[in-house]
């Protein structure tokens, strides 16, 4: 039994299966962006299979069988970790989604809701866009041209924008400070992507230092 399977098995023992009539609600959340993707139900077999395979599996109440998300579309949900709420009757499942989660082709099952997206979700989407630009035609966008010019040029831009931020702060122009900070963060994100990193790596380091 893998470590992940053992952890899931231990979690299953804590669930109040009688209270949930054998089906525990499972809220699925993107591990990187914290965006809620979907909600499904798991019985004990679905939970065990999720732990064994590392791919999120539900119990389909309509088909009355186990259903691994993405088994036909390929848009699987790769398990990162899961936890129980305080009443031991609802799961929070954190995943790395491969492709869109909703059967309609949207990122989440709530994409039709006009609710305002969180800043972290938006930032994650920006990082995905920047990552896609790495393989784009250098003439197609400024970002693609930066990648084409290499790490040295990207690093130079980060340095230049850092100076611009400092000058804006010194001048006391708050509007200019916001604009220059946006430029700095954008170029920093490009540099991180160039090096195979993301803002999550930076955030994790900040969390580590905060302990």
Swiss-Prot record:
Chain positions covered by the region annotation Phosphoribosyl-AMP cyclohydrolase: 1-122
Matching InterPro entries: His_synth_HisIE, HisE, PRib-ATP_PPHydrolase-like, PRib_AMP_CycHydrolase_dom, PRib_AMP_CycHydrolase_sf
Record key words, sorted: Amino-acid biosynthesis, ATP-binding, Cytoplasm, Histidine biosynthesis, Hydrolase, Multifunctional enzyme, Nucleotide-binding
Record Pfam families: PRA-CH, PRA-PH
A GO MF term: phosphoribosyl-ATP diphosphatase activity
EC class (word): hydrolase
EC number: 3.5.4.19, 3.6.1.31
Name of the featured protein: Histidine biosynthesis bifunctional protein HisIE
Name of the gene this protein is made from: hisI
């Amino acid at each position: 039994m893998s470590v992940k399977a053992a952890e899931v098995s231990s979690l299953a023992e804590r669930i109040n299966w009688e209270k949930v009539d054998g089906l525990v609600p499972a809220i699925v959340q993107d591990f990187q962006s914290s965006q809620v993707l979907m909600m499904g139900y798991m019985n004990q077999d679905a939970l065990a299979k999720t732990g064994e395979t590392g791919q999120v599996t539900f119990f389909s109440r309509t088909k009355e069988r186990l259903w691994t998300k993405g088994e036909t579309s390929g848009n699987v949900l790769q398990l990162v970790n899961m936890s129980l709420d305080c009443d031991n009757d609802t799961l929070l499942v954190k995943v790395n989604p491969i492709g869109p989660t909703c059967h309609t082709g949207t990122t989440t099952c709530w994409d039709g809701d006009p609710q305002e997206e969180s800043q972290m979700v938006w930032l994650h989407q920006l990082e995905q866009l920047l990552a896609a630009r790495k393989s784009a035609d250098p003439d197609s966008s400024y970002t693609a041209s930066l990648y084409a010019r290499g790490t040295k040029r990207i690093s130079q831009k980060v340095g230049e924008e850092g100076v611009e931020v400092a000058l804006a702060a010194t001048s006391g122009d708050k509007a200019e400070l916001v604009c220059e900070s946006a430029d700095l963060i954008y170029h920093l994100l490009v540099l991180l992507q160039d090096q195979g990193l993301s803002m999550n790596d930076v955030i994790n380091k900040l969390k580590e230092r905060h302990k």
